[in-house]
């Protein structure tokens, strides 16, 4: 509904490496309600993830699917948004425990030569059902991505100036 969110609440890393970047709602009107704000936040985060992912694509990565995990992955709406933004099949990692900590332990075990991280991960976790992207929504999100990227560039100086104001008060 004409609402875009830049999710840079604590700065941004890849691809901008900009600690001064800040969150911005573009297009906000009195007609937007809670549901539109929440969806804009979800879409903004998904677009930022795709923006970072694009760096890997530029370096030659071409994944067959996207695998997500964690809190956001439990939301069917967020899975749908991520799938449509990325334009690739999506699956959710189905595993118990703290997935980040377990992943770090698997990598550490591989680094020490104790185990093969890929084999250990396959025995520990499985993937949920495959979700395929909707081509129409993917095209819409690609247009939104262009606006999203342009909005960051247009506001980059504003972020710096706001930081200056904050440091003076």
What does each of the following model-derived ranges do?
Residues 1-169:
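Glycine/Thr-rich phosphate-binding loops that ligate phosphate moieties of nucleotide
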